[in-house]
From Swiss-Prot:
Record's protein name: Small ribosomal subunit protein cS23
Gene name in the database record: ycf65
One GO MF term attached to the UniProt entry: structural constituent of ribosome
Principal subcellular localisation of the protein: plastid
A Pfam match: PSRP-3_Ycf65
Superkingdom of the organism of origin: Eukaryota
GO BP annotations listed: translation
Function per UniProt: Probably a ribosomal protein or a ribosome-associated protein.
Family recorded in the similarity comment: Belongs to the chloroplast-specific ribosomal protein cS23 family.
Any single GO CC term annotated in Swiss-Prot or TrEMBL for this entry: ribosome
């Protein structure tokens, strides 16, 4: 049975949060809590989690962390005059393998 790692983002006005889920078959199980940015270093917290899990490959870890970096950068650079739904839609198009929950 294929195991898939899924990044889930919570898009908020003043912060963005990320967590990691695992999909096995039709079931999705949370692996982490939400790590928030900029209140804390969500990227560093996820890196620490990934390094502590020997079953997650280095390649998967690098890909996940790169995606987190790109999404956080996208969130930082967004036009705050544009409705967040448009940003979230653009993000889902750019990263079809992630889940984005937002306002």
């Amino acid at each position: 049975m294929k195991k898939e790692l899924i990044l889930k983002f919570l898009w908020l006005e003043k912060s963005i949060a990320v967590c990691l889920d695992q999909k096995v078959g039709d079931s999705i199980t949370p692996l982490t809590e939400f790590f928030f940015w900029p209140q804390k270093d969500a990227w560093e917290e996820m890196k620490n989690f990934l390094e502590s899990q020997s079953w997650i490959t280095q390649s998967d870890s690098v890909n996940l962390l790169n995606n987190i970096t790109e999404v956080i950068n996208f969130w930082q650079e967004r036009d705050t005059n544009v409705i967040d739904r448009k940003h979230i839609s653009n993000l889902r198009e750019k990263f079809p393998d992630i889940i984005v929950i937002g306002q």
